[in-house]
Each structure stands twice: as structure tokens, then as C-alpha cells.
């Protein structure tokens, strides 16, 4: 599964700065929790490729992004 990393508690995407945080996004995507193949920063958010179907990506159905 491919998609944007999402914070399950806030429903928001993981933010990043393109060309600066690519390695951070990759580490998050290939972590033992998410088990993705590769990750990078795309349009200011971490995007992952090759994650298991069970891994939640943005958007979470029925949940909007809220940082409050």
C-alpha cells in the first residue's frame, strides 16, 4: 500500500520539508511498525511506498485532522 503517513491520534499527515527530511520520512516508513519499502517527503508530507495493507494511511475514514 502507498500513501501519506498519518498520526492516528490527530488524523493529520506527518509534515516534512522536501529535500531536507527525505531520510527522516524514509526511516519512518521502513520502521518495524510500518514495514514499508521506501519513504520520502512529497508536497510537505511524508509519503510511503510498499506498506502492508493493514497500515493506516491518510485520510482516516471519519476522522478529520485536528491538532487541538
From Swiss-Prot:
Family listed: Belongs to the long (4 C-C) scorpion toxin superfamily. Sodium channel inhibitor family.
Keyword set, alphabetical order: Disulfide bond, Ion channel impairing toxin, Neurotoxin, Secreted, Toxin, Voltage-gated sodium channel impairing toxin
Localization, UniProt: Secreted
One annotated Gene Ontology cellular component of this protein: extracellular region
Stretches that traverse the bilayer: none
Protein source organism: Centruroides gracilis
The UniProt record lists the keyword Nucleotide-binding: no
GO molecular function, a single term: toxin activity
Biological classification of the source: Eukaryota, Metazoa, Ecdysozoa, Arthropoda, Chelicerata
Protein name: Toxin Cg2
Amino acid at each position: 500500500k502507498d500513501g501519506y503517513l498519518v498520526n492516528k491520534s490527530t488524523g493529520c499527515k506527518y509534515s516534512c520539508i522536501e529535500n531536507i527530511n527525505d531520510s527522516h520520512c524514509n526511516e519512518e516508513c521502513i520502521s518495524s511498525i510500518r514495514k514499508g519499502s521506501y519513504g520520502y517527503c512529497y508536497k510537505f508530507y511524508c509519503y510511503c511506498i510498499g506498506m502492508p495493507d493493514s497500515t493506516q494511511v491518510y485520510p482516516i475514514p471519519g476522522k478529520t485532522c485536528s491538532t487541538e
